[in-house]
């Protein structure tokens, strides 16, 4: 039962000890290096088929590669995507952003305001945590919106209601989070 207390002392001590032991156990296995190399080759292969989702009048995705290990958020047209060599337009370079801001940003997705999808909420995790910082981004100017929505790091669940209102589930204080640390209260946030 002690491990069920996600942030409990015993659970955290168990995690720390497992984290201390794991690298040695993994890296001394003869299969480790070949598996790591294969995984790296797959992750950075230039012939991967890019998975995409609708983004405005085109398609978008997040794409890590050898040049941008953190990835770029990019878009292309449907016609270009159908070709052997789609032409991609970078919207946000996560590696450059991380360097400029001195953070270990990991792109955790976007949510764009329908129907134009020119204003998007970008989810950025510092170091790959579940918690994200959410910032408003303009795909037309390819920049964060000055004075736009900017929520501090948290385990948020956020949706657009309209151009000036978000529906936000986050830690609003005592009694607003589950035992696992996720929000279950939703409020409207206006500009």
PLM segments and residue spans:
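Beta-propeller folds
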Residues: 1-191
């Amino acid at each position: 039962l002690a491990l069920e207390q996600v942030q409990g002392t015993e659970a955290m001590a168990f995690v720390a000890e497992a984290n201390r032991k794991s690298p040695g156990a993994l890296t001394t296995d003869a299969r480790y290096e070949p598996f790591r190399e294969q995984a790296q080759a797959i992750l950075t292969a230039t012939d991967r088929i890019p998975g995409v989702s609708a983004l405005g009048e085109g398609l978008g995705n997040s794409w890590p590669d050898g040049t941008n290990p953190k990835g770029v958020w990019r878009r292309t047209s449907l016609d270009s995507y159908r070709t052997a060599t789609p032409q991609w337009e970078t919207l946000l370079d996560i590696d450059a952003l991380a360097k400029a801001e001195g953070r270990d940003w990991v792109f955790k997705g976007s949510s764009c305001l329908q129907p134009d999808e020119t204003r998007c909420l970008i989810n950025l995790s510092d170091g790959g945590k579940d918690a994200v910082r959410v910032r408003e981004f303009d795909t037309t100017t390819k920049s964060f919106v000055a004075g736009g929505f900017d929520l501090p790091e948290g385990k948020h669940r956020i949706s657009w209601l309209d151009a000036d209102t978000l529906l936000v589930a986050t830690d609003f204080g005592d009694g607003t989070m589950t035992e696992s640390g996720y929000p279950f209260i939703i409020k409207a946030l206006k500009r």
